[in-house]
UniProtKB/Swiss-Prot annotation:
KW Disulfide bond (keyword) present: no
Species: Bacillus mycoides (strain KBAB4)
Name of the protein described by the UniProt record: Small ribosomal subunit protein uS7
Family that this chain belongs to: Belongs to the universal ribosomal protein uS7 family.
Single GO term (MF): rRNA binding
UniProtKB keywords: Ribonucleoprotein, Ribosomal protein, RNA-binding, rRNA-binding, tRNA-binding
Annotated signal peptide: none
Keyword hit for rRNA-binding: yes
GO BP: any one term: translation
Top-level lineage group: Bacteria
SUBUNIT field: Part of the 30S ribosomal subunit. Contacts proteins S9 and S11.
GO CC terms: small ribosomal subunit
Function: One of the primary rRNA binding proteins, it binds directly to 16S rRNA where it nucleates assembly of the head domain of the 30S subunit. Is located at the subunit interface close to the decoding center, probably blocks exit of the E-site tRNA.
């Protein structure tokens, strides 16, 4: 923990095309080896694929997808009297967004399509329709929280 108090949150700049901080955060989350330009190109091309496939604005589809991925509850380990309990806790709004973006990128990378643009586009489309691996991850997280509801009184 820092001795000089809490570390200030860095604010990201909105991206040039959609003027959205959320898109910038997704670009940063996808970035590998500091290649932000490449990450940006991949995302914008993926958004074009989304526009072609869904006949809707890609930002609308992306925001709906993210809404369907973001978890409300998660479990955190809490040690009580020599036993570890999985305690369900509510997820803070900032962490919800972060987890949603992380799961979207991770499960897009695991898909079978040929290019990352296609993988990301189809994962966004699937998530916006409440399908896909990222949405399944959210469902699994919620199931774990539901299964451990008995330990909710250990919250801190």
């Amino acid at each position: 923990m820092p001795r000089k108090g809490p570390v200030a949150k860095r604010d990201v700049l909105p991206d040039p095309m959609y003027n959205s901080k959320l898109v910038t955060r997704l670009i940063n989350k996808m970035m590998v080896d500091g290649k932000k330009g490449k990450s940006q190109t991949i995302l914008y091309n993926a958004f074009e694929i989304v526009r072609e496939r869904s006949d809707k604005e890609p930002m609308e589809v992306f925001e709906q997808a993210l809404k369907n991925i973001m978890p409300v509850l998660e479990v955190r380990a809490r040690r009580v009297g020599g036993a570890n309990y999985q305690v369900p806790v509510e997820v803070r709004p900032e962490r919800r967004t972060t987890l949603g973006l992380r799961w979207l990128v991770n499960y897009a990378r695991l898909r079978g399509e040929k290019t990352m643009e296609e993988r990301l586009a189809y994962e966004i489309l699937d998530a916006s329709n409440n399908a896909g691996a990222a949405v399944k991850k959210r469902e699994d997280t919620h199931k774990m929280a539901e299964a451990n509801k008995a330990f909710a009184h250990y919250r801190w």
